[in-house]
């Protein structure tokens, strides 16, 4: 029953991302919509810098009292708020109209992720997965999914009734709907602990957290590298079509994170070995993801039409969602067990795979441009080729060095 509930939460999160995108596409001009895409990309890339590995640091310190674990978490949260403030000021220079949204959402992401990892340190995986899927780079994923989903559905109804709503209302409503779900847990768990940041703690924290932070930053860059470049180089119509396809194709990966998270729990319980339960979750993940991908490629554009959103160029939309879907299913098929590399502390292997992606992506994009394949085509094809190599490397690393028997 708990697993089913968590799966529903993942479906809600996928719906939230889609509804938010569709509402902004209807509310904003193409130029403003392009800026909103830049906001989402900026959040995705900055979030792991803020989290800075605090969660895994808490878990990997071994058995300790709840008081010590939560004091460490409070230290990390305060440091995360400071980093959010610094990034918020940088965002003001880059995005003067939306920097306050970036700051608030970074703090929320930091809060929900740290609460999640505190529960994880107590082996309360159900609550941990409610507050986060274990990845600080995935934006604000928390128990606020349900309240945020209800808020966005309300916004959609208001829009259909032709009641005027604004982008600011949409973002602040999202922030508040998530905030109400994390305030109580934060107050309950952290208010009685004192902040105690020392030079020794900062050294240990930085040494332990840097690798995790770098990995999640690279994960985020890999997921958003194409839309990051497209949003700054392409014209607003291409950004419009590309981002719509990007959001739709991401649905299968969001569902996949549920099965991957459940598998990590089984992996730890089974002394870091692949058992039958993990294999079942693996095949279920592939099956569900494949069905979602097929459905998205067939009816994706009609889903947009149903909500009154029409791509500027339907050919661009369909081609992007097809290529992104191919990359997603390849990663799910090969990279599913590779997620265990994080648990087994194989940081070096993960970082090498990520850096190979970055180098290959930049190299292929430049080569495509030299060969005359310019614009969004070269970025999309470069991403796909690099993503396939990246997924294959993760698979080979785990099969060669991990406890892999299937």
Each language-model region and where it sits:
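Transmembrane helix-bundle signature of multi-pass secondary active exporters and lipid flippases
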Residues: 40-48, 219, 242-261, 292, ...
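Helix-loop junctions and terminal segments of transmembrane helices
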Residues: 48-66, 249-273, 342-343
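Short membrane-interface helical motifs at transmembrane helix boundaries
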Residues: 24, 82-102, 291-312
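Membrane-interface junctions at transmembrane-helix termini in multi-pass inner-membrane proteins
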Residues: 60-61, 110-142, 269, 326-355
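Signature of the first transmembrane helix
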Residues: 1-55, 84, 210-237, 293, ...
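Membrane-interface helix-loop junctions in multi-pass transport and translocation proteins
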Residues: 25-35, 90-101, 126-129, 133-181, ...
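Interhelical loop/hinge segments that connect adjacent transmembrane helices in multipass membrane
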Residues: 100, 129-142, 163-223, 269-276, ...
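Alpha-helical transmembrane segments of multi-pass membrane proteins
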Residues: 43-49, 86-89, 95-119, 172-180, ...
């Amino acid at each position: 029953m708990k697993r089913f509930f968590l799966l529903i939460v993942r479906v809600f999160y996928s719906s939230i991302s889609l509804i938010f995108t569709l509402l902004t596409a209807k509310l904003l001009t193409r130029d403003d919509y392009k800026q909103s895409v830049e906001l989402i990309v900026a959040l995705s890339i900055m979030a792991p810098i803020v989290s800075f590995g605090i969660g895994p640091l808490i878990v990997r310190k071994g058995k300790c009292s709840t008081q010590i674990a939560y004091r460490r978490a409070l230290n990390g949260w305060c440091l995360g708020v400071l980093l959010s403030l610094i990034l918020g000021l940088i965002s003001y220079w880059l995005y003067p109209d939306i920097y306050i949204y970036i700051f608030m959402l970074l703090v929320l992401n930091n809060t929900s992720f740290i609460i999640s990892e505190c529960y994880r340190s107590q082996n309360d995986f159900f609550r941990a997965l409610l507050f986060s899927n274990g990845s600080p780079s995935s934006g604000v994923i928390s128990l606020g999914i349900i309240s945020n989903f209800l808020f966005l559905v309300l916004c959609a109804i208001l829009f259909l009734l032709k009641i005027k709503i604004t982008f600011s209302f949409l973002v602040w409503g999202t922030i508040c709907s998530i905030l109400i779900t994390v305030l109580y847990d934060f107050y309950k768990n952290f208010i009685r602990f004192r902040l105690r940041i020392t030079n020794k703690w900062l050294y240990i924290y930085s040494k332990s957290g840097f690798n995790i932070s770098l990995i999640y930053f690279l994960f985020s860059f890999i997921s958003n590298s194409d839309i990051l470049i497209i949003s700054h180089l392409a014209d607003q119509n291409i950004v419009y079509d590309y981002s719509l396809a990007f959001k739709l194709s991401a649905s299968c990966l969001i569902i996949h994170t549920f099965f991957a998270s459940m598998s990590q729990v089984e992996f730890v319980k089974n002394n870091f070995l692949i058992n039958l339960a993990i294999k079942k979750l693996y095949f279920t993940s592939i099956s569900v993801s494949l069905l979602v991908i097929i459905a998205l490629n067939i009816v994706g554009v009609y889903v947009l039409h149903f909500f009154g959103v029409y791509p500027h160029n339907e050919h661009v939309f369909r081609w992007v969602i097809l290529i992104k879907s191919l990359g997603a299913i390849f990663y799910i098929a090969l990279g599913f067990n590779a997620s265990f590399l994080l648990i087994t502390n194989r940081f070096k292997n993960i970082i090498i795979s990520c850096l190979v992606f970055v180098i290959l992506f930049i190299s292929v994009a430049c080569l495509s441009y030299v060969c005359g394949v310019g614009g969004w085509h070269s970025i999309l094809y470069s991403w796909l080729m690099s993503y396939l190599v990246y997924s294959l490397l993760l698979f080979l690393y785990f099969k060669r060095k991990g406890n892999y028997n299937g």
